């Protein structure tokens, strides 16, 4: 799939949380809160002014209730507005 966001939007690939605790206990999908995950990798950018400083490959934290989900086979992506990106990790 070749998706290019337009305007001040960003295509993100959510980063799955570790489903094991530090002590090695495996968590069920219900207890790991995967539905509220809010970290992702930037896959593509639009051309908006608010995107300054964000690059493809950056790891970001975004508003967990934002964006539109898109699926490509088994891979899930999100398209979010630039203002929904809260921070760059690293």
Swiss-Prot record:
Keyword Cell inner membrane: no
Coiled-coil spans in chain: none
GO terms under cellular component: cytoplasm
Keyword DNA-binding among record annotations: no
SUPFAM superfamilies, alphabetized: GroES-like
Gene3D superfamilies, per database record: GroES chaperonin
Origin: domain of life: Bacteria
Pfam family, one: Cpn10
Residues passing through the membrane, by range: none
Alphabetic keyword roster: Chaperone, Cytoplasm
InterPro entries documented for this protein: Chaperonin_GroES, Chaperonin_GroES_sf, Chaprnonin_Cpn10_CS, GroES-like_sf
Molecular function terms, GO-annotated: ATP binding; metal ion binding; protein folding chaperone; protein-folding chaperone binding; unfolded protein binding
GO BP term, example: chaperone cofactor-dependent protein refolding
UniProt-annotated location(s): Cytoplasm
Family: Belongs to the GroES chaperonin family.
Subunit-structure text: Heptamer of 7 subunits arranged in a ring. Interacts with the chaperonin GroEL.
Known role: Together with the chaperonin GroEL, plays an essential role in assisting protein folding. The GroEL-GroES system forms a nano-cage that allows encapsulation of the non-native substrate proteins and provides a physical environment optimized to promote and accelerate protein folding. GroES binds to the apical surface of the GroEL ring, thereby capping the opening of the GroEL channel.
Stated name of the protein: Co-chaperonin GroES
Naturally occurring in which organism (per UniProt): Fusobacterium nucleatum subsp. nucleatum (strain ATCC 25586 / DSM 15643 / BCRC 10681 / CIP 101130 / JCM 8532 / KCTC 2640 / LMG 13131 / VPI 4355)
């Amino acid at each position: 799939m070749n998706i290019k966001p337009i305007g001040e939007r960003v295509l993100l690939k959510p980063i799955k949380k570790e489903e094991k605790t530090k002590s090695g206990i495996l968590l069920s999908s219900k207890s790991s809160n995967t539905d509220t995950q809010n970290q992702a990798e930037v896959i593509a950018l639009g051309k908006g002014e608010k995107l300054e400083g964000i690059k493809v490959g950056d790891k970001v934290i975004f508003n967990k209730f934002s964006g539109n989900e898109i699926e490509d086979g088994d891979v899930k992506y999100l398209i979010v507005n630039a203002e929904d990106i809260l921070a760059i990790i690293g």
